[in-house]
């Protein structure tokens, strides 16, 4: 009888361990938040990225739930052109001295099987918070052949209107205010 009780308790403990959400820490060396923005109303597209990002994802594949919190260092903006980088950080555009970070906080809202397919949340940038939906274009977890630990990777896309956040530089010159976001990230279980 005691063996049956012990076996049942062990089975319950194992089942709850498998069902528990896992917290993943984003790997800054494998996280690439990039964007594409209009220059002079269709003259060209300017592409850039942010070099410094941190965050975490809580993911429960069995419950099909999860959340994410990401912080981007605005001072790490990189167009590949130092003068443009400095202009983007200035009070005329991002005002990085006053608003040094952008943050996204959201929850997974759609799944494709057990993989998240969409996250809805809020983006805070330039002191303004607005709802944003992120489309999760791909999501995969594997055991890394290098570290022998689990790692998950994701490709995310969205489009925002930067004027909604008070970052409307160039509107008087006809700059389209829509910005396409393309984000690649990898993370591993925390701890």
What are these regions (language model features)?
Residues 1-18:
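Gram-negative bacterial Sec-dependent N-terminal signal peptides
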Residues 19-191:
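Low-complexity, acidic/polar, glycine-enriched regions of mature
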């Amino acid at each position: 009888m005691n063996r049956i009780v012990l076996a049942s308790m062990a089975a319950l403990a194992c089942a709850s361990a498998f069902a528990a959400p896992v917290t993943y820490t984003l790997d800054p060396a494998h996280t690439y938040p990039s964007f594409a923005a209009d220059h002079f109303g269709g003259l060209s597209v300017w592409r850039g990225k942010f070099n410094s990002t941190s965050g975490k994802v809580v993911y429960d594949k069995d419950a099909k739930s999860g959340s994410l919190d990401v912080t981007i260092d605005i001072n790490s903006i990189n167009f590949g052109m130092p003068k443009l980088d400095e202009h983007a950080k200035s009070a005329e555009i991002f005002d990085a001295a006053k608003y040094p970070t952008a943050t996204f906080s959201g929850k997974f809202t759609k799944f494709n099987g057990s993989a998240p397919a969409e996250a809805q949340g809020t983006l805070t940038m330039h002191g303004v918070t607005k709802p944003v939906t992120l489309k999760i274009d791909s999501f995969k977890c594997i055991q890394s052949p290098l570290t022998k630990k689990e790692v998950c990777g994701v490709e995310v896309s969205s489009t925002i209107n930067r004027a909604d956040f008070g970052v409307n530089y160039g509107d008087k010159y006809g700059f389209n205010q829509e910005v396409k976001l393309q984000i690649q990230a990898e993370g591993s279980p925390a701890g």
